[in-house]
Amino acid sequence: MARLPQAIAVDAGSTDPGPYYLGSGHSFTNREAVKRDLALIIEAGLDAGIPVLIGTAGGSGAAPHLSWCLEIVNDVLVELNQTARVAHIESDQTANDLITALHEHRISPLGPVPSLTVADISESTHIVAQMGVEPVVAALKEGAQIVVAGRCYDPAVFAAVPVMQGFSEALALHMGKILECAAIAAIPGSGSDCMLGTLDADGFVLEALNPERRCTVTSVAAHTLYEKSDPRLLPGPGGVLDLTGCQFEQVDDHRVRVTGTQFAKSDQYTIKLEGAKPVGYRTISLAGIRSPDLIAQLDTVLESVKDQVFQNFGDIETAEVKLLFRCYGRDGVMGELEPMRQAQPHEIGLVIEVVAKTQALADTVCSFTRSTLLHIGYPGRQSTAGNLAFPHSPSDSSHGLVYEFSVYHLLTVDDPLTPFPRRMQHLGISS
């Protein structure tokens, strides 16, 4: 804070942990850990008189995540004996609005995903849209000291203040693209330290504030490519960030300067939609396999087990139950794409996974599958004591509802503010 920043921003969410958190409305982060971080950030921001910006609040940015984060913000303000003007920006999209947009042909797939259907929309528990900088800038202009935003384009909360002050949107977004992962763009990388971005008319400088870390041309350039399929063009709300002419310069041991970024506005303003829907209930069992004879013929044995399971439950449609085997140590991470799949490991960590329409059915099928594999015979078997080694007792775990991403599409809008209603309130101690 001695460097006198003009804003403190944090990207608080991601789809990386999977669809469960958006679908269920739960946060993937621990409440006490979030409260600890927000207490430090909010106190520093209020003391310095600068805005605190929280993007994708609660991890996924839907209404329950927003409420969860606002409650923490209020608790922090009360404990600090402070009050603040807090804007929260909603990103939830109603089913009716999206069905209308679908019929008006304003929704298109984002990448290699199927076209959206009315059923996809109706079955989703939460659907959020990814806002750009405009709603955040609007909240700041309305006097917000703290902005708690729903689902955000990751750089948006970092770019909002510079854009509001008239700086290049291209440079502000590119700077935000790197700052959103903090010191991961430094060497050695870490998600636990802050980074400082300083913007001017022609470029920006990134600095690792921890003296044990440093920004290098390689680390900053590499993070520019982070999670992107195209090394030059980075699409986002309202346009495309063009890095074709981008230059990276080492200023000193800890700082890198970036110039040359361009931003091409789209003819039509599009925002990304994300939705998740429940698809059943999951039960898993973890086991180790050490027998080289079993490992050598594992695919055949697992297929035999699967056949026995569905023969035993003859009244169950295969569409009602999904039975999966994940073989860690062989191809558990990459599956059929694993280039070294034929290399026989000395042991395998096996995950038996069942997804069914009820938890009871998932439990039952998983139990039968585990028992069948434990005792099944195979050529060369030397012991009948059991084929599996279980690290836990009980060996099976019920995981509850399973979600999958049901919406990953683009929505064309006339106004970047309309899909994201704002509300201002005073939180903290009573005035």
Pin down the residues of each PLM region:
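Small-residue-enriched flexible segments
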Residues: A9, P51, I127-V128, V157-R330
